[in-house]
Amino acid sequence: ISSPVSXLTIHPLRNIMDMLYVGXITI
């Protein structure tokens, strides 16, 4: 996964989904 900033700029929805996915695994 590239830097969160670039991912957020290029694919905001994709970045949010990744954050939720990773957050679910972490929690």
UniProtKB/Swiss-Prot annotation:
GO molecular function: aspartic-type endopeptidase activity
GO-annotated biological processes: proteolysis
Keyword Protease among record annotations: yes
Entry PTM: Glycosylated.
Signal peptide (residue range): none
Tissue: Placenta.
Origin superkingdom: Eukaryota
Key words of the record: Aspartyl protease, Glycoprotein, Hydrolase, Protease
Top EC class, one word: hydrolase
Enzyme Commission number: 3.4.23.-
Family: Belongs to the peptidase A1 family.
Record-given protein name: Pregnancy-associated glycoprotein 55
Organism in which the protein naturally occurs: Capra hircus
